């Protein structure tokens, strides 16, 4: 598994706009085809152009693993229908006032760390659609668990100030080793600059050598 630097819309915040699992990368409408082909090749997936809630913010608004994808209630019916048709996944909608689902849920194929802002009913929906166990807990004082942690099925990166005991809890839930890291030259909101599936890790173009070493420990060792 490689770690590769990339940028999107001339910036390093690749995780805001893109979502990926082991089969598909979801990219915004109008995204350059040459870049789409490159990303798909690196990640070993097919690419699909879509919008969510008529925006480009796919990574921020949805959460996807290899079993399902969860959309916010602001997603349009035609977007839901398109993803249902094109993806061999359970497709669900979370009926919550919180719509940036990628910011409040961190999931792999085994577990999901969910923001305390979401309800027990929301957790049940997450569990049903993604096929995972859930836990609700802040990370380093943040309710936005999906912003400060990224996981695949072999590792996870978490906010540099995350509590060690919490990391053990999350490690048991997700079934992976977890390492503290930042991204893009000191940004602690790791999901903004990482795309992780089980084939490759793509990071924002400003990510430093020491950060790549931390991510190597998280995902490759």
Swiss-Prot record:
Q: Name one GO cellular component term.
A: cytosol
Key word tRNA processing present: no
Q: Which biological process terms from the Gene Ontology are attached to this UniProt entry?
A: assembly of large subunit precursor of preribosome; cytosolic ribosome assembly; maturation of 5.8S rRNA; maturation of LSU-rRNA
InterPro entries, A to Z: eIF6
What SMART domains does the annotation carry?
eIF6 (SM00654)
Family named by the database record: Belongs to the eIF-6 family.
| Functional note | Binds to the 50S ribosomal subunit and prevents its association with the 30S ribosomal subunit to form the 70S initiation complex.
Q: What is this protein called?
A: Translation initiation factor 6
Which organism is this entry from? Nitrosopumilus maritimus (strain SCM1)
Q: Which gene encodes it?
A: eif6
